[in-house]
């Protein structure tokens, strides 16, 4: 899976975290592991321009998605395996997202992870134009975010335990040559 990130926003964000959450969602949604995704981070002026040009709406927004190939999660079990495809582009505005994060009482990293999930789901055909669609998409988005955060916490705890184990073994000189 290829995920490219281009940060043109002027705001320092963890590209590694963005790739991690995108990769997690793509995997959970059974998208071909050879799929490609492009993520672009823009400042508010550039995002406002894009928002007006594509959605005919004034001002910046938090996330926009531009699907390339029509991909859907899962599929019929007897269907032939689709080949790798270009999912599309997700455009994020960290400055706008920071305002939303402050209003919601969580970190910019949390907000960008949420918006990345939102963007990937749009690329996979999910929408929130109708109440039923919104309920389905937002429930899935929340579940995926919760699962990704749990996976990150577990990996962090495992890394800490591995480090403690390594230090203990070093102190015991268990691996010293006789």
Swiss-Prot record:
Job description of the protein = Single strand-specific metallo-endoribonuclease involved in late-stage 70S ribosome quality control and in maturation of the 3' terminus of the 16S rRNA.
Instruction: Give the enzyme's EC designation.
Output: 3.1.-.-
Q: Which InterPro entries match?
A: MetalPrtase_cat_dom_sf_prd, YbeY, YbeY_CS
The protein's organism comes out as Mycobacterium marinum (strain ATCC BAA-535 / M)
A GO CC term assigned to this protein in UniProt: cytoplasm
Which protein is depicted? Endoribonuclease YbeY
Cofactor remark from the record:
Binds 1 zinc ion.
Name the gene for this chain: ybeY
Q: State the needed cofactors, names only.
A: Zn(2+)
Cite the PANTHER family for this sequence. Answer: ENDORIBONUCLEASE YBEY, CHLOROPLASTIC
């Amino acid at each position: 899976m290829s995920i490219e990130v281009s940060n043109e926003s002027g705001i320092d964000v963890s590209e590694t975290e963005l790739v991690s959450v995108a990769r997690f969602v793509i995997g959970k949604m059974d998208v071909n592991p050879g799929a490609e995704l492009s993520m672009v981070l823009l400042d508010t002026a550039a995002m406002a321009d894009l928002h007006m040009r594509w959605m005919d709406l004034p001002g910046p927004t938090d996330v926009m998605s531009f699907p390339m190939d029509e991909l859907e999660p899962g599929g019929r079990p007897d269907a032939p395996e689709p080949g790798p495809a270009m999912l599309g582009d997700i455009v994020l505005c960290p400055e706008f997202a920071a305002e939303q994060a402050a209003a919601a009482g969580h970190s910019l990293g949390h907000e960008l992870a949420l918006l990345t999930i939102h963007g990937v789901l749009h690329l996979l055909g999910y929408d929130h134009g109708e109440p039923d669609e919104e309920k389905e998409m937002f429930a899935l988005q929340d579940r995926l975010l919760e699962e990704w955060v749990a996976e990150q916490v577990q990996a962090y705890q495992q890394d800490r335990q591995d480090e403690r184990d390594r230090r203990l073994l070093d102190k015991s000189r268990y691996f010293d040559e006789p």
